[in-house]
Amino acid sequence: MAFVSEREIVRKIFSKKIDFTILAFFYISSIFFLLCSGVLFQYFTAAFTKGNCYECSMKLDYIKQFYFSLETAWYLISAVAVFIASVFIQHRIKAYLTLLAITWIVLTITDVALIHALDNIAMNNILLNILYNLFGAILLSLFMCLSNSLLFHLNKIKHIPMILSAMIPLVSAIIIAILITAVIYLLFARQAVEIEMDISEGSDIAYVGVKDNEESFGFLNDKKTDTPTYLDVIKNGSLIYNDTQGLSGADIYIVSGCYALPDLLRNVPLDAKKSFLNVKKLEITQKLPMMGFIQGESADVMPKAASRLSLSKQDDKFMLASSVTDSQIKFKSNNAQLMVAFAFMPITTNGILHDYTYDIIINDKKYKIENHVAPLSRLDKNKKMKCEYQQISDLTNTYNINANYLTGFLLVLKPDDIINYNNSPSVLLKTDFAFYKKTYQKLDKIYDDISNGKLSSLRATGISQFSINGKHLSLRPESEIIISEGSLYGLVNKSKKIKIYGTADLVFVDNKIMNLRKITYLQSKLEIFGSSIMDILKYIFGLGLLAISIKFIHSYFKNDVNENLFL
């Protein structure tokens, strides 16, 4: 059959609308499944690292996202474009080269659009996609040409209805997609491993506990403490003191000219006439960052998201530090005195604020604090800090503070002597993000503030001891460990060391996954089918599969006939 113009093919399509619709459905579905399986193949073979596989799993739910998700839905556009190009197939070799070029371009445009949407524009990603797309276009174009020839033979020569003929490419595409997925599963599925690690000086871990905070591993999870807890409240801090009996006393000060540190806040002048009595509730809310400390009889951190824990040594003291996001920390009084002190860090995206206000609400009565802070000069840097105090009382509702350097507040909260074990007065800190830490003179005192409990995942550096299935791994101080989807337990052992151990489903050490299933596991899976890895290699190379394929493709394209389905 001679070459026919595209206009003539379009005219024929309009005369065979039903066949075109049937063909469009089955072809587009076939191309889509093949493209999705290609995405799966590229994802695991090209970039199987912590960056894109932190939560990956070869479970069914994870595999499904490569075929049925918003990201892969974009490839429907590519599938439609490739199908439209295939409609105009006439002579085999010309059609193949045209399809190859169009498929390569369409896939590259789609990938660039997705990379841009995911804000991951890097030249290495684009170049890698171009190479994979070329490989995919070569195979997909061959599939389309072979499918077209098969449909032409069945529909035009054997006169089998289009709806039955068009099912064959779809069934073939589904089988190919299943085979690719199965191979990826056998090669990249993970094997759960037993891990054990020590957290020592210099360690820094970010971790996620379990939903029940009482069962979670953590720092200051409902622990008695007689030393201050230092806090850097970075975002949206709210302090609430509650005394259900309403019998507490409170001395409240506006502090300026110094940081809120226990060593600086000494010999605070007290005017008993300005003390507040019968305090039931006290609240301070501030969006500005603030730094200070809270000292109570016990502390209970209630994280809602990932926490962080680091152990370090500064001068002659050890420090245990952590951070929380969107969380609460409760400091209980156990009917002893509570002290709360914070200095504001008036830093915004537009610079440093010199004028700002906040409210102190006591028993629903508002006291407005207006701050006017002079800028810090070069000469002031050499001056010794001196705290200045202004005690507030219920007689004045508004206070104007002209200060140097810093302003903040000091709360001295005095519960009644009547002991209420079930619900003693407490201070609750709510924050979107905060750091908290404690210092210790002796290392062994640190472990009193650690709660034994469960973890589900972690990211760690500075780990001194780490083993997988009993095998010790040699690590550098900067080596990074990532464990996800695990059943872990953290505790302080008899030797006064913090240990984390348990079962992990995903383990990375310095970007390298450590728990891929061994080749012996793949061997055992193949033995179920009465085969082995060597058998497969024999089939591939012993039968000369590659040579046979090349010979078939050569003979196929040599017979360059016109096989358009609508002519």
From Swiss-Prot:
The chain crosses the membrane at residues 20-40, 69-89, 95-115, 126-146, 168-188, 528-548. Keywords: Cell membrane, Membrane, Transmembrane, Transmembrane helix. It comes from the Bacteria. The keyword ATP-binding does not apply. GO terms for cellular component: plasma membrane. Its main location: membrane. Disulfide bonds: none annotated. It is a multi-pass membrane protein. It is found in: Cell membrane. This is Uncharacterized protein YfjW. It comes from Escherichia coli (strain K12).
